[in-house]
UniProtKB/Swiss-Prot annotation:
GO biological process: urea catabolic process
Catalytic activity: urea + 2 H2O + H(+) = hydrogencarbonate + 2 NH4(+)
Enzyme class (EC, first level): hydrolase
Gene3D superfamilies recorded: Urease, beta subunit
EC numbers, comma separated: 3.5.1.5
Subunit structure: Heterotrimer of UreA (gamma), UreB (beta) and UreC (alpha) subunits. Three heterotrimers associate to form the active enzyme.
Gene behind this protein: ureB
Pathway(s) per entry: Nitrogen metabolism; urea degradation; CO(2) and NH(3) from urea (urease route): step 1/1
Gene Ontology CC, one term: urease complex
Top-level taxon in the UniProt lineage: Bacteria
CDD domains according to UniProt: Urease_beta
Name of the featured protein: Urease subunit beta
A molecular function (GO) term: urease activity
Length: 101
């Protein structure tokens, strides 16, 4: 093994298997692009993004770790969200939760 090397099984791996998901339509109403990372609590993203925030509480983008989705000004797109796992507590971000979900 080489330091830092990652060994994986052959075939494909399903991300977030068995976790609750939901789809939301999101529109960027601002005049600047907004980029949202893979593990950002979607409920607390930039206020220029217009969508059903209550439905996004406790969810993040259902994309690979370390990636992001970019919303251009005026763009509307449908995104898939996945439920947060672990202790299901959220701290930081915009400070809108600061505790258990």
């Amino acid at each position: 093994m080489i330091p830092g090397e990652i060994l994986t099984d052959d075939g494909e791996h399903e991300l977030n298997a068995g976790r609750a998901t939901r789809s939301l339509v999101v529109a960027n109403t601002g005049d600047r692009p907004v980029q949202v990372g893979s593990h950002y609590h979607f409920f607390e993203v930039n206020d220029a993004l217009s969508f059903d925030r209550a439905a996004a509480r406790g969810f993040r983008l259902n994309i690979a770790a370390g990636t992001a989705v970019r919303f251009e000004p005026g763009q509307t797109r449908t995104v898939e969200l996945v439920a947060l796992a672990g202790e299901r507590a959220v701290y930081g971000f915009q400070g809108k939760v600061m505790g258990p979900l």
